[in-house]
Amino acid sequence: MTKDFRQNVFQGRSVLAEKDFSAAELEYLIDFGLHLKALKKAGIPHHYLEGKNIALLFEKSSTRTRSAFTTASIDLGAHPEYLGQNDIQLGKKESTSDTAKVLGSMFDGIEFRGFKQSDAEILARDSGVPVWNGLTDEWHPTQMLADFMTVKENFGKLQGLTLTFMGDGRNNVANSLLVTGAILGVNIHIVAPKALFPTEETQNIAKGFAEKSGAKLVITDDLDEGLKGSNVVYTDVWVSMGESNWEERVKELTPYQVNMEAMKKTGTPDDQLIFMHCLPAFHNTDTQYGKEIKEKYGITEMEVTDEVFTSKYARQFEEAENRMHSIKAMMAATLGNLFIPRV
């Protein structure tokens, strides 16, 4: 019998949601991302996907995800092809299944950023190639690889740290943080109004993983309880893409703004405390949105104050850069025929 030397526990797998991966697998991808970042900084080529063609499907617009997948593909020696909302017809003029079969016959891998998690799952099922979820309404796994890579880069470890998310506890980033932290043994606190707590289904998924990893999960509307002992304070926009209920959210979430008072509530020494945000952030009035919010609601900052955003705690731009390195690791591991027989 001929031995297959292309042993790889990731080869051919799609990355649709964090819950599909073990703690060891996620940590491997995070560490691989740190390794590829070091290679990039040292100018050492790593063309693991030479000759591959990558489809980048975007129903939702993007700055960081598109840029990260494009540069990651090129660094790996692959050719990325962008297909925007005017180029793809998922479920409109062509079924998602039919689109998957066509793209799978032409491309070696597919990134999908859109609304429905079911579309990502159909693409993965019917394309025959790895599909990477660049964001859906439910989950944001590529953001999580970058986020926990950033945490490990700053603290040298993951297990036993505490991350507090403040804001809309039902959005995809909060869902993914809760579940990924639970898998990795990171304590996750969600601080939000009761009406915006994560769904019971999401909480149950996270609790199942936390029982194995020892992660402590806290979901509360009390800032003091949620922030105490935190190493990472994390927030996201108050209104997600596709939503329009600004007035309601501003009223609900203003008490959950990340400001210096919130950072102090952690009681954590400065050298053990960072702030993170997946971006874009409404921290001043330098944008059209920022100006409109000021005119309508009389506030100049939303989910985070400019003071925190520009402070010594801020790591959001490292986090944004790490999107590229972590996505590169994920793509190479799942498509590059690398030798990864176990993790």
UniProtKB/Swiss-Prot annotation:
GO terms for molecular function: amino acid binding; metal ion binding; ornithine carbamoyltransferase activity. It is found in: Cytoplasm. It catalyses: carbamoyl phosphate + L-ornithine = L-citrulline + phosphate + H(+). The keyword Transcription does not apply. Keywords: Arginine metabolism, Cytoplasm, Metal-binding, Nickel, Transferase. It is an enzyme of class 2 (transferase). Pathway: Amino-acid degradation; L-arginine degradation via ADI pathway; carbamoyl phosphate from L-arginine: step 2/2. It comes from the Bacteria. Its EC number is 2.1.3.3. Its main location: cytoplasm. Ni(2+) binds at residue 79. It holds the Pfam family OTCace_N. One of its GO terms (cellular component) is cytoplasm. Ni(2+) ion bind each monomer of the trimer. Carbamoyl phosphate binds at residues 62-65, 89, 113, 140-143, 278-279, 323. L-ornithine binds at residues 172, 236, 240-241. GO terms for biological process: arginine biosynthetic process via ornithine; arginine catabolic process to ornithine; citrulline biosynthetic process. Involved in the catabolism of arginine. Catalyzes the phosphorolysis of citrulline, the reverse reaction of the biosynthetic one, yielding ornithine and carbamoyl phosphate which serve to generate ATP from ADP. The C-terminal end of the protein is critical for the stabilization of this oligomer. PANTHER family: ORNITHINE CARBAMOYLTRANSFERASE, CATABOLIC, ORNITHINE CARBAMOYLTRANSFERASE, MITOCHONDRIAL. Belongs to the aspartate/ornithine carbamoyltransferase superfamily. OTCase family. This is Ornithine carbamoyltransferase, catabolic. It comes from Lentilactobacillus hilgardii. The lineage of its organism: Bacteria, Bacillati, Bacillota, Bacilli, Lactobacillales.
